[in-house]
Amino acid sequence: MSNQDEPQNSPEEFAEDQQADVALEEASSDSSETAADVDLVARIEALEAELTEAKEQALRAAAEMHNVRRRAEQDVEKAHKFGLEKFVSDMLPVADNLGRALEAAAAEGADMTAVTEGVDLTLKSLMDSLKKHGVESVNPEGEPFNPELHQAMTAVENPDAEPNTVINVYQVGYTLHGRLVRPAMVVVSK
């Protein structure tokens, strides 16, 4: 077909067709921009909702941490206040027995043998209570000197003992659950 066979548009028709094409393109671009805008707005709203939820979760977590910290501080405070309660209740009978021993010793015509036996039993009760709470005595007589557990007060010549051996204990030492509370004060052989 030749160019002459195609229907010719008048310049007015051509201009109208051009305007229609431009309007159609604008309408389609407006609708695509509107759809894109709607998608962006929806995405922004979703992100804002997520942000709000994250902030609320962070606030709840901070409040929970504050409560946990407060409860832990209260537990530590109670442990400091009442941690020795069982120990004290075990020591009270010892104190009572010592009081009775003093009364018996002060009584007129007191039998010192009975007082001595009473004090010995009280000491045994005290040592049993201490042991029950993890306190052990360090009485190293005859053992090699250990500077981690013993404090040498003096060193003397002793032909009957090996050098660096504890030959006398001035004061017994104590450990609490294996940790030294007080070293034993000792005399060591040279």
From Swiss-Prot:
* Signal peptide annotation: none
Instruction: Answer yes or no on keyword Disulfide bond.
Output: no
Entry keyword annotation includes Kinase: no
Q: Locations of Acidic residues compositional bias?
A: 13-28
Its subcellular locations are: Cytoplasm
Classify the source by domain of life.
Answer: Bacteria
* Ranges of Polar residues composition bias in the record: 1-11
Instruction: Enumerate the Pfam families for this protein.
Output: GrpE
The record's keywords, sorted A to Z, are: Chaperone, Cytoplasm, Stress response
Give an example GO biological process. Answer: protein folding
Query: What GO CC annotations are associated with the protein?
Result: cytosol
Note the CDD domains from the entry: GrpE
List the InterPro entries: GrpE (IPR000740), GrpE_coiled_coil (IPR013805), GrpE_head (IPR009012)
Checking Gene3D superfamilies in the record gives:
3.90.20.20, Head domain of nucleotide exchange factor GrpE
Q: Which GO terms describe its molecular function?
A: adenyl-nucleotide exchange factor activity; protein homodimerization activity; protein-folding chaperone binding; unfolded protein binding
Cite the residue spans of the region called Disordered: 1-36
The family line of this record is: Belongs to the GrpE family.
Function as written in the Swiss-Prot or TrEMBL entry: Participates actively in the response to hyperosmotic and heat shock by preventing the aggregation of stress-denatured proteins, in association with DnaK and GrpE. It is the nucleotide exchange factor for DnaK and may function as a thermosensor. Unfolded proteins bind initially to DnaJ; upon interaction with the DnaJ-bound protein, DnaK hydrolyzes its bound ATP, resulting in the formation of a stable complex. GrpE releases ADP from DnaK; ATP binding to DnaK triggers the release of the substrate protein, thus completing the reaction cycle.
According to the record's subunit comment, the protein's assembly and interactions are:
Homodimer.
Q: What is this protein called?
A: Protein GrpE
Source species of the chain: Teredinibacter turnerae (strain ATCC 39867 / T7901)
